[in-house]
């Protein structure tokens, strides 16, 4: 039991995420903070996905005669899960990377709970002051530097965990904090999404292969502000469908950016993005949206990328938000892996994404 109530951590809470003191006992033993539920029913309903946190926090030491273990010691932790495509996770995950004590960090860095975000749910988009805008420009510039360095390392044979290490080290070289690290208990410093993974892929021991495509999603936190961007890259030579997919996703983003100005409606971005995707035989993911970003990692406004959405609000000078359309070769719907982060296409076909932070 916790002395200070926090919102229920269930994503589909039956009581609309009220404050709660009921803590997962296993998380408590492992030192994982912030795993609270409003009632036993919510805890039981989320057990199948929640328990994955325990596996991540406690790297498995498999038996040598375990048939599910590869000769190099790697393994698929979700062997009974019905994957939608050919990609598989390759565990164990490396230990959590350390951030030097002198680097300021967001409020969720220790316990995984973005308290400031939770407090400001439902509030309108914030207009930044000139000095805040300069901090946003600086952190976005640094995030671009880190992304470009990580992208230069892409080659067949490198693991996504090695890419995570590059992003982490380059981030702390800039006296910044890697925003994804421990955000809602995400275990790594960057998201690496390969082939059919739409977003939030967790870096692991899988080696990139010739013909893969990979999205690297970098966010830095510095001077109290977050800068967020991502791009999708080919690994060596890729097939024509993958090239078409990446071209389409890139065009969707940049045609939407052209619409951005004070007075433009957020809901109109999808009217430009979705026709481009359809004309190229692709679909637009509806589950995830762009978002406001400033001193909070995710905040208002929501920025849908599909047509006929019901997003509210107009763009105003001083707002900062992301546009990040996720484009699929097949159906727009998705499936989550049991790690509760990795989102893949429902049909196993490939997905690509490009993202920028807009001012």
Where are the language model's segments positioned?
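Active-site neighborhoods and metal-handling regions in enzymes and metal-associated proteins
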Residues: 2-5, 12-20, 31-35, 47, ...
């Amino acid at each position: 039991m916790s002395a200070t109530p926090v919102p229920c951590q269930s994503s589909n809470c039956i009581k609309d995420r009220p404050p709660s003191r009921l803590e997962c006992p296993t998380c408590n033993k492992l030192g994982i903070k912030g795993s609270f539920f409003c009632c036993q029913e919510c805890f039981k309903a989320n057990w199948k996905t929640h328990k994955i946190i325990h596996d991540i926090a406690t790297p498995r030491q498999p038996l040598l005669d375990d048939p599910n273990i590869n000769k190099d010691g790697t393994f698929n932790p979700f062997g009974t899960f019905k994957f939608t495509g050919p990609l598989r996770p390759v565990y164990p995950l490396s230990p959590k990377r350390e951030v030097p004590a002198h680097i300021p960090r967001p409020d969720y860095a220790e316990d995984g709970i973005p308290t400031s975000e939770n407090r400001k749910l439902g509030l309108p988009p914030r207009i930044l002051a000139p000095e805040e805008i300069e901090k946003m420009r600086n952190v976005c510039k640094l995030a671009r530097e880190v992304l470009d360095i990580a992208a230069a390392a892409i080659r067949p044979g490198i693991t996504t965990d090695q890419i995570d290490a590059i992003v982490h080290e380059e981030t702390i070289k800039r006296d910044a904090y890697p925003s994804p690290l421990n955000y809602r208990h995400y275990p790594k410093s960057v998201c690496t999404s390969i082939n059919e993974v739409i977003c939030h892929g967790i870096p692991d021991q899988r080696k990139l292969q010739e013909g893969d495509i990979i999205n690297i999603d970098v966010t830095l936190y510095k001077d109290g502000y977050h800068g967020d961007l991502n791009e999708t890259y080919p690994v060596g030579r890729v097939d024509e469908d993958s090239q078409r997919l990446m071209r389409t996703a890139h065009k969707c983003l940049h045609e939407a950016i052209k619409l951005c100005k004070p007075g433009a409606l957020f809901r109109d971005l999808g009217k430009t993005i979705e026709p481009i995707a359809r004309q190229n035989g692709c679909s637009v993911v509806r589950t995830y949206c762009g978002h406001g970003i400033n001193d909070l990692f995710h905040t208002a406004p929501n920025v849908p990328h599909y047509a006929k959405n019901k997003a509210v609000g107009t763009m105003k000078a001083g707002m900062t938000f992301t546009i990040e359309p996720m484009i699929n070769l097949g159906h727009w719907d998705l499936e989550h892996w049991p790690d509760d982060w990795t989102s893949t296409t429902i049909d196993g076909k490939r997905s690509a994404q490009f993202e920028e932070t807009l001012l």
